[in-house]
C-alpha cells in the first residue's frame, strides 16, 4: 500500500493488523482527551509496527501518519500470531527487531540530552537527513513537533532555525 504525506495509517485506540514500513517515514502521535497531540515516535524503513504488538495483540498506542510518501506492507494479525506459534524461532527475529529499536532510542536519547539546544537540533537534523534528503526537517515536522521531540519550546526552535538561516 502507498501512503502519501499526511495520510493516516492507523488511529490510536483501534486494533488491527501489523505493518512493515518498506520505505518512507511515519510519525506516531498521541492524541489526548483535550484534542492536543504530542509526537511520541518516528518509524523508519524496515520497522514492523506497532512494536508493542509484535508478540501479542494490543490496541494502537498512537496514530500513525506519513511524513513523506511511504510504501507499507499490511501484515494480518491472525496470520502474524499463528506464524509465531508455528515457528518459535521467529521470536528471536522479533527480539532482534526490538533490540534495533532500543538502540535507535538510545541514539535519540543522546540527541535530547545534548547540553545546548542548538546541538540537539543539529543532531536531529543530521539524523533526519539519512531518511528525507533532499527535504529538510522543517519540510516534514512542524516547529511544535520538533520541540516536542527535543523537549524544547517551539519559540526556541524558531529562534534556532532563524539563527541557522542567518549563518548560511
Across the structure, where does each feature detected by a protein language model lie?
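A small-molecule sensor/coupling module
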Residues: 79-116
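Phosphate-/nucleic-acid-contacting segments
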Residues: 120, 124-168
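Short beta-strand segments in beta-sandwich/barrel cores
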Residues: 8, 25-30, 48, 71-72
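Short aromatic/basic micro-patch
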Residues: 42, 74, 140
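Ligand-binding loop in jelly-roll beta-barrel domains
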Residues: 55-78
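Short acidic-glycine-tyrosine-enriched beta hairpin
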Residues: 1-2, 7, 33-49
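Short beta-strand His + acidic residue motifs that chelate non-heme Fe in jelly-roll/DSBH
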Residues: 28-29, 51, 62-66, 149
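Regulatory nucleotide-sensing modules
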Residues: 1-23
Amino acid at each position: 500500500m502507498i501512503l502519501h504525506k499526511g495520510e493516516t495509517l492507523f488511529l490510536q485506540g483501534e486494533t488491527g493488523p501489523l505493518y512493515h514500513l518498506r520505505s518512507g517515514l511515519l510519525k506516531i502521535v498521541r492524541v489526548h482527551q483535550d484534542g492536543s497531540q504530542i509526537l511520541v515516535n518516528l518509524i523508519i524503513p524496515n520497522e514492523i509496527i506497532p512494536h508493542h504488538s509484535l508478540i501479542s495483540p494490543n490496541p494502537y498506542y498512537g496514530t500513525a501518519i506519513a511524513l513523506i510518501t511511504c510504501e507499507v506492507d499490511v501484515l494480518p494479525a491472525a496470520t502474524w500470531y499463528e506464524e509465531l506459534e508455528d515457528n518459535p524461532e521467529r521470536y528471536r527475529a522479533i527480539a532482534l527487531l526490538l533490540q534495533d529499536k532500543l538502540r535507535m532510542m538510545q541514539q535519540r536519547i543522546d540527541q535530547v540530552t545534548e547540553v545546548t539546544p542548538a546541538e540537539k537540533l543539529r543532531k536531529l537534523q543530521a539524523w533526519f537527513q539519512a531518511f528525507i534528503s533532499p527535504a529538510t526537517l522543517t519540510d516534514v515536522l512542524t516547529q511544535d513537533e520538533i520541540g516536542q521531540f527535543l523537549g524544547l519550546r517551539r519559540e526556541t526552535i524558531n529562534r534556532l532555525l532563524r539563527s541557522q538561516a542567518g549563518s548560511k
